């Protein structure tokens, strides 16, 4: 494959991923942010069970928090090409997000998360 063809293919994939993330953020999640299949459960630890994630295409995950009382969704992180979903990998999307949470960012409470997001 020529370099130009590889670049075009990579750009096409990025466009496809971006389009899917946009649709997820503005259509799928807002339609039903508390869906059972979006719940993480104990995947990244019991202390992080309030977090949600939605699968985008096969290897991308969009992580968010949702507060049903205020009806606010805060999107926090989506993995990139360096942290694709790969079970057991140190760079797996879930492992990477858990490390972020363990490091204190994003904040663990919804109130702090909302405050931080408003400051950005």
Model-derived regions, located:
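Basic, Lys/Arg-enriched alpha-helical interface segments
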Residues: 1-60, 66-120
